[in-house]
């Protein structure tokens, strides 16, 4: 990897953040560029998110001087300010269904039970901060990413209006679907339950040629990046699982020439063929599970193997899909930025051009 991201911190620790290695020098960057992304995922913005009040204000600690990146590691930090660790005292010695409590204990023999510690959704703060930088790189190169909520529970969008995405609490491009999603969530909340959904990501301006032909296929890299998000249970590219009931005659994307350029006549593949970008729009979908923290009684056991009926109290999202939209976008941006830098050495002509442009 050329563009590397390390996240650090826990949900109820002093702070969280990220270290980014491999960002080129000379990229215009300030804290506001990153804050815009963090504001899209921060809690407490609607009745459908956790009541935890965090400003999630980012601090750039290194790697930026006089408004531009220096080419050295960029260190970012966001301080936790509204932890309520007492809310988690009742689960210190029991395993919450749907969480990583049991598996962390099995792996490490020890865990931070306060808000899930490292497995908390707050870990994604570092991903989003790094994603903001990756997105700035892509923007400089004419690549744009549009990410939105495709569905919440059984409610799916029936129309697409890009301007509507930031006009509702769910980041849905369909105003009517957003209203129905709100009604569905009200019912979930009344029943002390939660919901999942689907996030769709569309990337335009990507050049053909990104990705490797075997193990590091662009499709595999993107799927790995999205599946590394805690709540993601499945990833689709292009027509996804629908191709299993299709035929080659309808699934294959044909080619034609327009204005002297080779283009595809359709995009069932979602912009990636043979693991390599083909220059058309890249289409991804991430399937998000329902929030596992619910107030309904759930059957579990303690560390001592005693049965227990557990009710999870605290401040939890009835749905995490809207706040995960920018997380999916950030992971896609990080993956593409890295693929771009790796691809710079894919041909000798590109290496010769670099040497030629930098010779005295």
Predicted feature residues:
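Generic N-terminal targeting/processing segments that precede catalytic cores or assembly contacts
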Residues: 1-360
């Amino acid at each position: 990897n050329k563009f590397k991201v390390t996240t650090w911190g826990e949900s109820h620790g002093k702070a969280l953040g990220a270290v980014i290695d491999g960002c080129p020098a000379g990229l215009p960057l300030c804290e506001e560029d990153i804050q815009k992304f963090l504001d899209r995922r921060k809690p407490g913005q609607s009745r459908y998110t956790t009541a935890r009040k965090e400003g999630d204000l980012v601090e750039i600690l290194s790697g930026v001087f006089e408004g531009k990146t220096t080419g050295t590691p960029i260190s970012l930090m966001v301080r936790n300010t509204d932890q309520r660790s007492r809310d988690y005292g009742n689960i210190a010695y029991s395993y919450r269904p749907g969480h990583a409590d049991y598996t962390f204990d099995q792996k490490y023999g020890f865990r931070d039970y306060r808000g899930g510690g490292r497995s908390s959704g707050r870990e994604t703060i570092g991903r989003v901060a790094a994603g903001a930088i990756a997105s700035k790189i892509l923007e400089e190169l004419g690549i744009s990413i549009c990410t939105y909520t495709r569905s919440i529970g059984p409610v799916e969008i029936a129309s697409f209006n890009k301007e509507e995405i930031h006009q509702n609490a769910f980041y849905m491009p369909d105003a009517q679907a957003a209203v129905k999603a709100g009604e569905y969530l009200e019912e979930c909340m009344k029943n002390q339950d939660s919901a999942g959904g689907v996030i769709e990501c569309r990337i335009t301006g990507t050049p053909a040629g990104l990705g490797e032909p075997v193990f590091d296929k662009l499709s595999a890299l993107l799927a790995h990046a999205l599946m590394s998000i805690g709540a993601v249970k499945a990833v689709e590219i292009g027509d996804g699982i629908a191709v299993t009931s299709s035929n080659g005659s309808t699934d294959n994307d044909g080619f034609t020439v327009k204005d002297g350029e080779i283009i595809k006549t359709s995009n069932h593949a979602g912009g990636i063929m043979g693991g390599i970008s083909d220059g058309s729009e890249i289409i991804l979908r991430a399937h998000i599970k329902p929030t596992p923290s619910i107030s309904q009684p759930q059957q579990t056991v303690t560390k001592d193997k005693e049965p227990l009926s557990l009710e999870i109290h605290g401040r939890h999202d009835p749905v995490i899909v809207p706040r995960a939209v920018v997380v999916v976008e950030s992971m896609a941006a990080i993956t593409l930025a890295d693929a771009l830098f790796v691809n710079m050495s894919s041909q000798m002509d590109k290496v010769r051009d670099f040497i030629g442009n930098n010779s005295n």
